[in-house]
């Protein structure tokens, strides 16, 4: 009743915000026990969007999140977070060029401070079966309650030893049911990244559909929300990074779509305003550090 009253009076969304206005209006909050699928072809920004939501909760809202990065290392993800939070390009961070620019150093100093204060935990172990993922999540949740889990991505979750001879479709069905059970057990939203079938690229209509989920099995049935990231590489908008997020399933709201601006150089999405946003975060003034000192400070949180 209190929840309904708050919603009636316009007091925010029901669940965690993504930090992206149009997406929040569409999704209406990431709720406890829900499984949210973010699907797309390689290069459409699945990891960027999933990590960005985790950053929103941990860096900007002081909540706790656990990211299972089955593909990238914790250091790679942390560099992306650093670029996103500092508005210093990922390329200049990766090559070290950022350390030769005073403004970049100031921005990075502020971002490093915010990241150190954030409870963003990263598990970088690859080839984990779901049973191991659930045990790690339980342990981390007991240590300090989590508000969100992100799994990047479902296709890299290893089969259980007892089911390795099964069809992969059946394995993914069991994995999907297990992820839903974990979300309900911990009563937190779980974001799961997923690949789309390559066959999209050979169709005349390249806009993805829910049926394009690779080895979809029971993923469509178990998920509470399915959103698909799509960027039209043949259009001027697509080439400038404008990305369509198509919510093709939502148990508690209407389906629909919104546009986000992908800023690949900063490894982040921002609100789409009809033009290329030149969004630069104003970092708080900070004492200038030497390049060596800053690099020593930059250690990925977690990485267990």
Where are the language model's segments positioned?
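C-terminal regions of RecA-like/P-loop NTPase motor modules
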Residues: 87, 129-146, 163, 177-186, ...
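Conserved Walker B
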Residues: 154
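The Walker A/P-loop phosphate-binding site
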Residues: 1-88, 103, 109-110, 296, ...
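Flexible beta-alpha connector loops of hexameric P-loop NTPases
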Residues: 12, 91-101, 121-127, 158-173, ...
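Cytosolic-facing regulatory segments adjacent to core modules
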Residues: 25, 56-145, 159, 258-261, ...
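Core recognition of P-loop NTPase motor domains used across DNA-transaction enzymes
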Residues: 1-33, 88, 102-105, 112-123, ...
